[in-house]
Swiss-Prot record:
Keywords: Acetylation, Chromosome, DNA-binding, Isopeptide bond, Nucleosome core, Nucleus, Phosphoprotein, Ubl conjugation
Subcellular location: Nucleus; Chromosome
PANTHER family documented for this protein: HISTONE H2B
Biased composition (Basic and acidic residues): 1-19
CDD domains from the UniProt entry: HFD_H2B (cd22910)
Name under which the protein is recorded: Histone H2B
Gene3D superfamilies: Histone, subunit A (1.10.20.10)
Gene that specifies this protein: HTB1
Residues joined by cross-link Glycyl lysine isopeptide (Lys-Gly) (interchain with G-Cter in ubiquitin): 125
Pfam families assigned to the protein according to its UniProt record, in alphabetical order: Histone
Length: 131
């Protein structure tokens, strides 16, 4: 039996990086690759808050998923209530006032007070940064 010849790697120029193809409606569009739709989550923000409050504590993927669902649910409830309040007052724009009132209606007692004060502080900080 003859000895096997050594395989040499093909000298190939490095492939150029192409910008990611956007998701298209039809897959037969000239052979373009479809990118996976991005799923937007609050994971990075939840993680930052966790590290501010408990620096030595981690969070599992399952717990992060639950927290993300929780934030989405609360956001949806507040947005829905704020939308109703704007409609009651015959306004087409949701303002900070509608959001604040929605928070007071949805969240119970002390939690609402803390949420309103933190929200007011965040809006003040944002407004001062704009000037």
């Amino acid at each position: 039996m003859a000895p096997k010849a050594e395989k040499k790697p093909a000298s190939k120029a490095p492939a150029e990086k192409k910008p990611a193809a956007k998701k298209t409606a039809s897959s037969t569009d000239g052979g373009k690759k479809r990118t996976k739709a991005r799923k937007e989550t609050y994971s990075s923000y939840i993680y930052k808050v966790l590290k501010q409050t408990h620096p030595d504590t981690g969070i599992s993927q399952k717990a992060m998923s639950i927290m993300n669902s929780f934030v989405n649910d609360i956001f949806e409830r507040i947005a829905s209530e704020a939308s109703k309040l704007a409609a009651y007052n015959k306004k087409s724009t949701i303002s900070a006032r509608e959001v604040q009132t929605a928070v007071r209606l949805i969240l119970p007692g002390e939690l609402a007070k803390h949420a309103v004060s933190e929200g007011t502080r965040a809006v003040t900080k944002y407004s001062s940064a704009q000037n």
